[in-house]
Amino acid sequence: MTRSDELFEQAKKTIPGGVNSPVRAFNGVGGSPRFIEKADGAYIFDADGKKYIDYVGSWGPMILGHNHPKIRAAVLEAVENGLSFGAPTELEVTMAEKVIEMVPSMEQVRMVSSGTEATMSAIRLARGFTSRDKILKFEGCYHGHADCLLVKAGSGALTLGQPSSPGIPEDFAKHTLTATYNDLDSVKALFEQYPDAISCIILEPVAGNMNCIPPVEGFLEGLRAICDQYGALMIIDEVMTGFRVSKSGAQGHYGVTPDLTTLGKVIGGGMPVGAFGGRKDVMQFIAPTGPVYQAGTLSGNPIAMSAGLAQMEALCEDGVYEQLAAKTQYIAEGFKAAANKHGIPMAINYVGGMFGFFFTDEEKVTSFEQVTKCDAEKFPEFYHGMLDEGVYLAPSAYEAGFLSLAHGEAELEATLAAAERVFAKMAKG
């Protein structure tokens, strides 16, 4: 039994399932999770001392790589002044100004402590601003674990949402409508049925919780037009894509302007953080300037702001995103080439610094339905093969992979060499 195995058994006695977030339990791939002791650059090290090339990056925040010296220095400097004040600081003003500078659609921004808190607050604000109750989300997209968002589609195309978790009253879920990602007709049908009741559309501009599904041409623009037609707000959830897909997020990459944006992950530099912002007239509707209430004890925490600012400033350097995109393309296309060489069908998607691969005969994967039909047996086999080779991928076929600027040629080549060996074994059966 490894030290990670021992820690997992120990953890299950005091922590539900032994983890503090379900995907970490390895239920999607089987086996025991690796307990991580430290990380540096493109690498993580488990409790047994084994070293892995990391393509999870704490689920996206570590875009510069782990334990980056500039972020570490900023945090250590901030800690000298105290950990939390529960009062305004210059740091949070500077962070707000930096976010607004990088994302033109955000005229004002409110800091919170998590992505879930950001999306929950943005939806409350949209409902309050429009005086409408219903929201529209997409099947397969994840926006945190707020009650109104853990909802799946009903049995019919135009049915009201059904709770996807116990503990969510149906009275809450009935206000959440679920459409099909990359299908404008499904959105139009819901707006035609509820023309004056939908407060907002919330979506991942690149769906990173059904692996990695970019928007098809015209999809985001079509959603913008529908929102304008019916007076609903468009909320782009950039908790994952913000400052990972491009310097101005996915909205900048695809050229679409939302009314509200949610952020997290990258803006914290590895510390717990979230934010939501957008049009000034909408943001002025939140307390204390407006009637919609939102608050947070640790919102704008100075340590998180310091870490985030250090990371954001580094991301503003010339050539950063071109470099990141080139690395991501190289690794994704390398996976596909290695798989195809050994007769294993694979489709790939990639945008900016995130990628996904799918064990399927389909040439292109653009929908949640396609993702659910991928080979459910090949992914765990490939995952554990790569883990044994010292490559740490997301332990779920429904999660995107992430590159960092710390991934150099040596790491990329070692990863593809490992994939080549694993695919060769898979082909032999």
UniProtKB/Swiss-Prot annotation:
It catalyses: (S)-4-amino-5-oxopentanoate = 5-aminolevulinate. Disulfide bonds: none annotated. It is an enzyme of class 5 (isomerase). The modification N6-(pyridoxal phosphate)lysine is found at K265. One of its GO terms (molecular function) is pyridoxal phosphate binding. Its main location: cytoplasm. It comes from the Bacteria. SUPFAM superfamilies: PLP-dependent transferases. CDD domains: OAT_like (cd00610). Gene3D superfamilies: Aspartate Aminotransferase, domain 1, Type I PLP-dependent aspartate aminotransferase-like (Major domain). One of its GO terms (biological process) is protoporphyrinogen IX biosynthetic process. Its EC number is 5.4.3.8. It holds the Pfam family Aminotran_3. GO terms for cellular component: cytoplasm. It is found in: Cytoplasm. Pathway: Porphyrin-containing compound metabolism; protoporphyrin-IX biosynthesis; 5-aminolevulinate from L-glutamyl-tRNA(Glu): step 2/2. Keywords: Cytoplasm, Isomerase, Porphyrin biosynthesis, Pyridoxal phosphate. Its cofactor is pyridoxal 5'-phosphate. InterPro entries: 4pyrrol_synth_GluAld_NH2Trfase (IPR004639), Aminotrans_3 (IPR005814), Aminotrans_3_PPA_site (IPR049704), PyrdxlP-dep_Trfase (IPR015424), PyrdxlP-dep_Trfase_major (IPR015421), PyrdxlP-dep_Trfase_small (IPR015422). Homodimer. Belongs to the class-III pyridoxal-phosphate-dependent aminotransferase family. HemL subfamily. This is Glutamate-1-semialdehyde 2,1-aminomutase.
